[in-house]
């Protein structure tokens, strides 16, 4: 036995049905990616919606967009961006996933709740200096 270290082999790529398994992140960015696993695609839609909710929530809290127009704007942008993503960019058959409405509402309520928390949090943080100053009566 020699005193040298044993050389570790690099990990082999995972195989799925005899083909190389492609990572989810590379599929998200490629318009010609094939989505064999429906749950994997629905997970991507769900998390993409959550990212949109955080970004829009911070923007809405900083600007401050409030009321009906703020909520309606969030709903339209959130649904519109995802619809453009899966119908125009990926060009998937919506009927395989239960129709356009099923994909549009996938994870919507949790993203709406996250949006509301981010709006309140960023609005409060942006106006924290007013809350910290105590004015005598």
Swiss-Prot record:
Domain of life: Eukaryota
Any GO BP annotation: multi-pass transmembrane protein insertion into ER membrane
Signal peptide stretch: none
Transmembrane segments: 45-65, 67-84, 104-127
Main location: endoplasmic reticulum
Membrane topology: Multi-pass membrane protein
Compartments where found: Endoplasmic reticulum membrane; Mitochondrion inner membrane
Reported function: Component of the multi-pass translocon (MPT) complex that mediates insertion of multi-pass membrane proteins into the lipid bilayer of membranes. The MPT complex takes over after the SEC61 complex: following membrane insertion of the first few transmembrane segments of proteins by the SEC61 complex, the MPT complex occludes the lateral gate of the SEC61 complex to promote insertion of subsequent transmembrane regions. Within the MPT complex, the GEL subcomplex may mediate insertion of transmembrane regions into the membrane.
Disease: Craniofacial dysmorphism, skeletal anomalies and impaired intellectual development syndrome 2: An autosomal recessive disorder characterized by flat face, low-set ears, and cleft lip and palate, as well as costovertebral anomalies including bifid and fused ribs, vertebral segmentation defects, and scoliosis. Intellectual delay can be severe, with absent speech.
UniProt similarity note: Belongs to the EMC6 family.
Assembly and interaction partners: Component of the GET- and EMC-like (GEL) complex, composed of RAB5IF/OPTI and TMCO1. The GEL complex is part of the multi-pass translocon (MPT) complex, composed of three subcomplexes, the GEL complex (composed of RAB5IF/OPTI and TMCO1), the BOS complex (composed of NCLN/Nicalin, NOMO and TMEM147) and the PAT complex (composed of WDR83OS/Asterix and CCDC47). The MPT complex associates with the SEC61 complex. Interacts with NDUFS3, NDUFA4, NDUFV1, NDUFA9 and NDUFS8 of the mitochondrial membrane respiratory chain NADH dehydrogenase (Complex I).
Name recorded for this polypeptide: GEL complex subunit OPTI
Record gene name: RAB5IF
């Amino acid at each position: 036995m020699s005193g040298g270290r044993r050389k570790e082999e690099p990990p082999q790529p995972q195989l799925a049905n005899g083909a190389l398994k492609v990572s989810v992140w590379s599929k998200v960015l490629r318009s010609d990616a094939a989505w064999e696993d429906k749950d994997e695609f629905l997970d991507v839609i769900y998390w993409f919606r959550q990212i949109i909710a955080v970004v829009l929530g911070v923007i809405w809290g900083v600007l401050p967009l409030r009321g009906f127009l703020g909520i309606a704007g969030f709903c339209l942008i959130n649904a519109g961006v995802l619809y453009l993503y899966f119908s125009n960019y990926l060009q998937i058959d919506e009927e395989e996933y239960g129709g356009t409405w099923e994909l549009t509402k996938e994870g919507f309520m949790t993203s709406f709740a996250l949006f509301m928390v981010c709006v309140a949090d960023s609005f409060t943080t942006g106006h924290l200096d007013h809350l910290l100053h105590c004015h005598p009566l």
